[in-house]
């Protein structure tokens, strides 16, 4: 567990680990380039034993939210944070998104940030804004996913998302007007374009 918010003007950057065998909490000492004090970010355990931290929001000195699109990596053996090199179409700054491991990639969907909903379909004119972005775990390259579904996912934030047997489930959240209990299921795959380069599709 990392970070958090006290509901007022303070965010946290401390880390806590729960031992499921002894049922005790510990606060490990970490080093390196740790994320700032924030909340609403995501943590994903990669196949190489590193924890990836993306996005989130912190409270600025004037009380104005500061949104992030940083990607940090924690080596769980050395407990050292780093900023891995990543390329491609970087996601816009956001929080309350979901980043879900799907095969050898991470699917980033939803969130709230500069301009509101992080989707051009919702009227956000922020350059490079996209609701669904995929990070290749091997090449560390971001790509905007192409939606082939005539009924695409309803944009939201504060939702939950999980992958089950190649299908991406999104439930709940806030759609900008009200809380929702909608459940969306989409199939995630890869298609090859003319140049042979694969692009993620949903």
What are these regions, as identified by a protein language model?
Residues 1-202:
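Kelch-like beta-propeller repeat domains
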């Amino acid at each position: 567990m990392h970070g958090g918010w006290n509901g007022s003007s303070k965010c946290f950057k401390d880390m806590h680990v729960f031992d499921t065998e002894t049922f005790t909490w510990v606060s490990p000492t970490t080093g390196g380039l740790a994320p700032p004090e924030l909340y609403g970010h995501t943590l994903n355990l990669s196949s190489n034993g590193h924890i990836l931290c993306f996005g989130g929001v912190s409270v600025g000195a004037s009380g104005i939210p500061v949104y992030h699109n940083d990607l940090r990596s924690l080596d769980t053996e050395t407990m050292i944070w780093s900023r891995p090199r990543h390329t491609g179409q970087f996601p816009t700054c956001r929080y309350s998104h979901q980043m879900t491991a799907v095969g050898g990639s991470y699917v980033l969907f939803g969130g709230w940030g500069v301009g509101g909903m992080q989707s051009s379909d919702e009227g956000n004119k922020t350059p490079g804004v996209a609701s669904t972005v995929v990070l290749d775990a091997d090449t560390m390259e971001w790509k905007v996913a192409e939606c082939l579904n005539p009924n695409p996912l309803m944009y939201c934030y504060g939702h939950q998302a999980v992958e089950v047997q190649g299908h991406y489930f999104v439930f709940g959240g806030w759609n900008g007007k009200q809380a929702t209990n909608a459940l969306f299921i989409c199939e995630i795959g890869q298609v090859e374009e003319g140049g042979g380069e694969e692009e993620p599709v949903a």
